[in-house]
């Protein structure tokens, strides 16, 4: 640890020296083509990803929340999970073994917990199958799109989805080094460089490495990330872009702590897995080629080819139940080797049609792709003949490493084609109407190699979306929207048939008030329903059927305001009532897990310039998350409410150099982020501090 701190301190010293000796250099900046699928990063007043056309937020009949690059830096966001408390209506779900993918719900509805949340990238669908957690070195901003987006982006939840705006190659040469050290022995270093190769070609390279310990015993991870990008301006009207990302993450598979009789009895530090199981290894490779052509001032075309493959494998010993003595935890040992491969081709044509009575903004797009998903799992439960248990108060490791029989061996293939049409009609300066629909045709093949069964189903789904927007004046707008969604269910029922997909409906009304050019207050009321949710088969509890129905309704209030050049405030509040409407086992009114009825946050930042032109900033953030169900069956086990206080400060002696200090969980509150059951509970980090350095040159 001392060597790492020495390296960090030396880097800070070198950067201080360089700030007095390095001169700025510049090169000619070329104008690049503005692509709808490749925005420079969403901001408070402009939106592209919600309709594919760039608009003032007051002209769009939907709601969203944006986390800019500045906010991401101020709040020391290291993972998408860290950003969720700053967004209304978005809640943490279990992130699979301590952080092997991003997972969260929108307005109470979440996707398959064995795959993670659906995410789009620069307005393009890319996240089908497994995905490693996104690295922040490539992220310009996070755009949380609320409400029905299936008509634009295909299958997903009715509550919304996340659009990640990534950084791009630039024609002005620049480099950036970021170093970070945390009191929990978490270390990170990243390097970014972009420059022109010629007047027509520019590149960008990003590299990041993490070496993370944990406040939890025997839990650690190491992560490598590499991303080369290339942009070629073929002509004044045509541009070709290539993006790639390579991620490897090695780490402990950690299910967290367990409860006994619905009570929190364990020390949050205690690890009940098996260190001798070794690390889980995750590899994620992503490639994307985009071609954009501008026909004229009114019409353009975007094309994209995306290829993605991800693998996760390793051994783990996971909690199963605590015996009647209240201290002996029975474990289940597993080996998993899961892999997904996805290829997707997309084409979209966007244009404007001006008529005497209205202006039309028209989108026509198609998608063609294939995704393969393989699950291989070996597992064995604790038994008298082959024990595998541990004392939760005095764990002794290395006693049991039982041999494992094959338990799951499945392969799923999805071939899909989609056609999408949308038209937003601006009748005048006040009224606009948006209508659109997407038709999906999916062939789903599922093979259970262990049982020797297979099933195939062709699915057709039409997802409409309607929106009405009324802009009263330059400050006020009101809107309403309706949309439908669907999401595939993986697996087979007891008859060997592939499940029908989940189907959802969403209704929303809301208003927006632009207090100042840099301040926005927004209110949204919503109601959603979903059917064909998987539930236990009453004829055989070893299987499931699509007989469940759930609903969610609520209110979201967001404020983003820049009071002056120095002082900014960001606040949000959510009320979400998400519950079961129909189920074979659960009672009507049972709560959906990890969804608090009440939550909110408020943050403020104050910045000023000293007499010598040095810049200083101070900030604070308070987070509240209410009580929520901690079990997927809502069996009476609850995660308690919690309040966190975070602080941040920075000092920038030059435009090229910035030092930052962050304190997380200042009051050192014991809290729990999310859980899958009363056996798998993810505790939050205790009081910790981080120091970071940013050096641009």
Q: Where are the regions a protein language model picked out?
A:
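Face-selective signature of the C-terminal outer-membrane beta-barrel domain
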Residues: 287-310, 331-447, 471
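Acidic/polar loop-and-plug regions of large Gram-negative outer-membrane beta-barrel proteins
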Residues: 210, 214, 226-294, 307-340, ...
